[in-house]
Design a protein with these regions (language model features):
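Short, glycine/proline-biased beta-turn/loop segments that scaffold the active-site neighborhood
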Residues: 48-74
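Structured C-terminal helix/loop/strand segments within mature extracytoplasmic catalytic/sensor domains
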Residues: 19, 104, 149-179, 188-190, ...
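A short glycine/serine-rich beta->alpha loop
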Residues: 21-28, 75, 136-137
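Stable alpha-helical elements in mature extracytoplasmic
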Residues: 81-85, 93, 97, 101, ...
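Conserved catalytic neighborhood of penicillin-recognizing serine enzymes
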Residues: 64-99, 140
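A short, well-structured edge-of-sheet supersecondary motif
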Residues: 1-24, 208
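Mid-domain, small-residue-enriched loop/turn segments at the edges of structured enzyme/sensor domains
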Residues: 3-6, 99-151, 155
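Active-site SXXK
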Residues: 17, 29-57, 216
C-alpha cells in the first residue's frame, strides 16, 4: 500500500497450489521480461529442429543496441551461436542478442507460442529500441499472472519438452542481475528469474527454490524504481522465510 504507481504482484506456492495477487491481470509495458517469451520460443524451435543451437551469427555494428548486455561493447564481426544469444539475452538482458533472436524466430511465432501456453495478454508487438513503433504507442506487454504462468510451465516441464524446460531454468538460475528478488535471500538459494527496467518501470519475475518452492512476480509501471524494488526485496524475504518454516 506504500508503493505509488501501478504495482502488480503474483504469488504461487508450487508445493500447495495456493496463489494470490494484486492487479495481477493488469497489462503493463514489458521491458525485458518479454525476453522470457523469446527464450521459450527459441527453445521450442530448437526442439523442433527449425533452428540449430550452434547456428552462427556474425555481430555487425548495425546490430548493436545500447544499454543492457555485452555485445554492444565487443568487436564488430564477433561470431556467436544461437544458444549463446539465448544465454546473453537472459543472464545479461542483452538487447542486441534479443533483437537478433526475435528477427530469426519471428514475432508471430513468439506470440503463437504464448497463446498455446495460455498467455492471452502477454504480447510481443515490436523489436526493442524500435523508436518509430514506440512513437506510435506500440509496446510489448506482460501481466504478473501470465509471467507466473510461463514460469509454472517451465517448472512443470511443459514450456517445451521436459529437457528443454530444464535447460531454460538452468539459464535463468545463472541470472547476473540480482538486485531485486534475490537481494535479501541467502546466496545458497537457487532462483530462476528475469528482470526488466525502463523509465518508471521495474519488474522481476521468478521461481524461488525454498523448502516449498514458489513463484513470485513483481511488475511495476509508473513507479519509483527504488521504492518498488525495496518492496520486492522485503516481500520476497517474507515469503521465503514463510516457505522455509513450512514442513
Amino acid at each position: 500500500s506504500a508503493v505509488t504507481g501501478d504495482a502488480c504482484f503474483y504469488y504461487e506456492n508450487l508445493a500447495t497450489g495456493v496463489c494470490f495477487g494484486h492487479a495481477a491481470d493488469k497489462p503493463v509495458v514489458a521491458a525485458s521480461v518479454i525476453k522470457l517469451a523469446v527464450l521459450i520460443e527459441a527453445f521450442r524451435q530448437m526442439d523442433a529442429d527449425a533452428v540449430r543451437a550452434n547456428e552462427m551469427f556474425v555481430i555487425a555494428r548495425t546490430d548493436k543496441l545500447p544499454s543492457c548486455g555485452a555485445l554492444n561493447y565487443l568487436h564488430d564481426g564477433l561470431c556467436v551461436t544461437f544458444r549463446d544469444l539465448c544465454v546473453l539475452m537472459t543472464i545479461l538482458s542483452d538487447n542486441t542478442a534479443t533483437n537478433l533472436l526475435i528477427k530469426r524466430l519471428g514475432i508471430g511465432n513468439i506470440n503463437d507460442t504464448l497463446r498455446m501456453l495460455g498467455a492471452e495478454k502477454m504480447t510481443l508487438n515490436r523489436l526493442l529500441f524500435d523508436r518509430e513503433a514506440s512513437s506510435r504507442g506500440i509496446e510489448n506487454y506482460i501481466t504478473a499472472r501470465e509471467a507466473g504462468l510461463l514460469l509454472k510451465r517451465l517448472y512443470d516441464g511443459e514450456a517445451v519438452s521436459g529437457p528443454a524446460s530444464e535447460d531454460m531454468l538452468s539459464i535463468l538460475k545463472d541470472q547476473r542481475l540480482n538486485g531485486k528478488i534475490p537481494f535479501l535471500l541467502p546466496h545458497s538459494v537457487k532462483i530462476a528469474h528475469k528482470t526488466g527496467e525502463d523509465d518508471g518501470i521495474t519488474h522481476d519475475v521468478g521461481i524461488v527454490y525454498a523448502r516449498q518452492p514458489f513463484i513470485v512476480c513483481f511488475c511495476g509501471e509508473h513507479v519509483s524504481p527504488p521504492e518498488f524494488e525495496r518492496a520486492m526485496q522485503d516481500i520476497t524475504l517474507m515469503l521465503y522465510e514463510n516457505a522455509e518454516r513450512i514442513r
